[in-house]
Design a protein with these regions (language model features):
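Helix-turn-helix DNA-binding elements, focusing on the entry/boundary residues of the two helices
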Residues: 18, 29, 44-47
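Hydrophobic protein-protein interaction segments
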Residues: 109-466
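Short amphipathic recognition helices of helix-turn-helix/homeodomain-type DNA-binding modules
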Residues: 45-101
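A short, Lys/Arg-rich alpha-helix, primarily the initiator
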Residues: 1-20
Length: 471
C-alpha cells in the first residue's frame, strides 16, 4: 500500500479526523499541514501518536519529522535543528528534496493538472534532474510556505538553465474573493504571461484555484510574487513597485533574484518591462526591513529625514553582509524571511552562524540612542509583544534571543511605520539586558519618559563598559 494511503488508513482506524491529506501520486512524503479538523497546526502529541502508531521506515519517519517541524516552526526551531542533525547522522546528508523515480513524479505540460503540496520537492527534483523535462513544461503544485530549500533550488535552476523559459505555477488560495480572482485574470491576460489555468485540487475538495507566482524569465530572473492571504505577507504596493523599478534600473549587470510581496497584482504590469530587460537584484518589501544587494541602493532609498540616517544605513548594511555570508547565494528562502520577521534570526542557517554585536559596538549603539533621546526629546518604547508599535520615532522590541530597533520618520494614525528602517539584532545577552530593566517602564503601554529612557541607556552603557574593564 502506498505511503500516504497507509497513513490515512492508520489515522482513520484511530478515529483521527482527516480533512486534507495529499496521497495522490505515490509520493513518500505527506502533507501534515491542515490535516486535523482543518487546523493549521498539528499538536506535538498527535504527531508523536502518528509516528508511534505505524512502523515507518527511517526515511519516512525522517520526512514526517521534517514536515511537522517545518510547519510548526514558530514553536519548534530547536527541535527542527535536532531533527536535521539526526537525519544527517543517520543518512549522511540532509536532502533538500526527495529524488523519486520519474513514473512517481507529477510533471506535466501546460494543459495538464496535478495537485498537492506534499509532492512539491519530488516534482521539482525530477524536473531539475531530467534535462528533457526542462523545455516547455509547467509544474502545477499547491506550494508549501514552509519549505526551506525550495527557493534556492529554483534559483539554482534559473541561473543554470541554458536559455529555456520555464514556468512553475503554484496555487494561490484566495479565500473565495471573487474580485481578486477577476483582477488576477485580467492582469495575466493583459500582460500575456503563460496561460492562466484553473487547478482542480483533490486535497481541497475539487475547488478551483487561480495560479500565479514563480516565473523564470529567460532563465535569468526569478520573480516570486505571493498573494497568499493566509500567510499575511502583505504590505504597501506603491513602495514595492517603485523599488522593483529602481532595482531594474540600477542593477543591469546583476545575475541575482528579485522577490517581492504586494497587496495588488495589478501593479505587476508596471514592472514587467524593466524586469524582462534586465537581470534584477534581490529585494524584499514584505517586512519593514528593506533588504538590498547594494549599499548604494540602500543609501538612495533610506529617506533623509530618518533619524541618524547614516548610522542606520551602515548598521543595516553590515547586518546584511553577515546574512549574505551565511546563506547560499546571499538570499533568504521564504522560511528564512519568516524567521527574520518573527524571531530576528536573519538567516536560513542556524543561529550560531550569526554573531552577536560586540561590546564596543553596543556602547556605540546605546550612545546613538541616547543622543537621539536627548536631542529630539524622543520617548523610548520597550515591548515584549509580537506587534511593532511606534512611540514618536523610536521603538525597541525584545525577543527571547534578540531585539529589534525601529527608526521611523513618520507615524500615521494607526501607529504604523512610514519611511522607516527596521533593524533586528540576534543577541540573547543584549536582549536580557533590556528585560532586566523592566522596572523603568513607568507607563502601562510600556513607554519610557525621556528621563527614564536616559537612565536605562546609561545603565546599559555602564554594564557594557564594566564588561570591557573587567577583561
Amino acid at each position: 500500500m502506498e505511503f500516504g494511503a497507509l497513513l490515512k488508513k492508520t489515522l482513520k482506524e484511530n478515529s483521527v479526523p482527516v480533512t486534507r491529506l495529499s496521497s495522490d501520486i505515490g509520493c513518500t512524503r505527506v502533507s501534515l499541514y491542515s490535516v486535523f479538523n482543518g487546523e493549521k497546526k498539528l499538536s506535538e502529541d498527535t504527531f508523536k501518536f502518528i509516528l508511534n502508531t505505524y512502523d515507518f521506515s527511517p526515511l519516512q519517519a525522517s520526512e514526517l519529522k521534517r514536515l511537522f517541524y517545518l510547519e510548526n516552526i514558530g514553536e519548534s526551531q530547536k527541535e527542527l535543528l535536532f531533527v536535521l542533525k539526526d537525519e544527517l547522522e543517520t543518512t549522511g546528508k540532509i536532502r533538500p528534496f526527495l529524488s523519486l523515480p520519474l513514473k512517481e513524479i507529477a510533471v506535466c505540460n501546460e494543459e495538464t493538472t496535478i495537485v498537492g503540496s506534499a509532492e512539491y520537492y519530488s516534482a521539482i527534483a525530477a524536473f531539475l534532474e531530467n534535462e528533457a523535462l526542462c523545455k516547455n513544461n509547467v509544474i502545477y503544485t499547491n506550494y508549501s510556505f514552509f519549505d526551506i530549500q525550495a527557493d534556492n533550488m529554483l534559483y539554482d535552476f534559473a541561473i543554470n538553465n541554458k536559455g529555456n523559459d520555464v514556468l512553475i505555477k503554484h496555487t494561490v488560495r484566495m479565500g473565495g474573493d471573487i474580485d481578486i480572482k477577476e483582477r488576477l485574470h485580467n492582469v495575466f491576460s493583459s500582460v500575456k504571461f503563460a496561460k492562466l489555468g484553473h487547478i482542480t485540487n483533490a486535497s481541497t475538495g475539487g475547488k478551483k484555484n487561480f495560479t500565479f507566482a514563480t516565473y523564470f524569465i529567460g532563465a535569468k530572473t526569478v520573480i516570486q510574487y505571493d498573494n497568499e492571504n493566509e500567510c499575511g505577507f502583505l504590505t504597501g504596493e506603491k513602495a514595492i513597485v517603485d523599488a522593483f523599478r529602481l532595482a531594474a534600473m540600477k542593477n543591469e549587470k546583476k545575475k541575482t533574484v528579485l522577490t517581492g510581496f504586494c497587496e495588488s497584482v495589478l501593479d505587476l504590469k508596471e514592472i514587467l518591462t524593466p524586469l524582462q530587460k534586465n537581470m534584477v537584484s534581490f529585494l524584499d518589501f514584505r517586512f519593514p526591513a528593506n533588504i538590498f544587494t547594494t549599499k548604494k541602493i540602500l543609501s538612495e532609498t533610506v529617506k533623509d529625514n530618518v533619524p541618524y540616517r547614516d548610522f542606520v544605513i551602515e548598521e543595516f548594511w553590515n547586518h546584511l553582509k553577515k546574512v549574505q555570508s551565511s546563506t547560499p547565494h546571499g538570499l533568504f528562502s521564504q522560511l528564512g524571511l519568516q524567521r527574520f520577521a518573527r524571531d530576528g534570526i536573519a538567516s536560513d542557517a542556524s543561529p550560531e552562524f550569526l554573531h552577536p554585536i560586540s561590546t564596543e559596538n553596543r556602547i556605540v549603539l546605546f550612545k546613538k540612542y541616547k543622543e537621539s533621546v536627548v536631542k529630539n526629546n524622543y520617548c523610548l518604547k520597550i515591548m515584549n509583544s509580537d506587534a511593532v508599535r511606534v512611540t514618536e520615532h523610536f521603538a525597541i522590541e525584545i525577543y527571547k534571543d534578540g531585539f529589534s530597533v525601529l527608526f521611523c520618520s513618520e507615524v500615521n494614525s494607526k501607529e504604523n511605520f512610514i519611511g522607516g528602517c527596521y533593524i533586528i539584532y540576534h543577541d540573547a545577552e543584549l536582549s536580557k539586558l533590556f528585560t532586566d530593566f523592566e522596572e523603568y517602564i513607568v507607563l502601562s503601554d510600556g513607554t519610557l519618559s525621556k528621563k527614564y529612557a536616559e537612565l536605562l541607556i546609561d545603565d546599559l552603557i555602564g554594564q557594557c563598559e564594566s564588561v570591557i574593564n573587567n577583561g
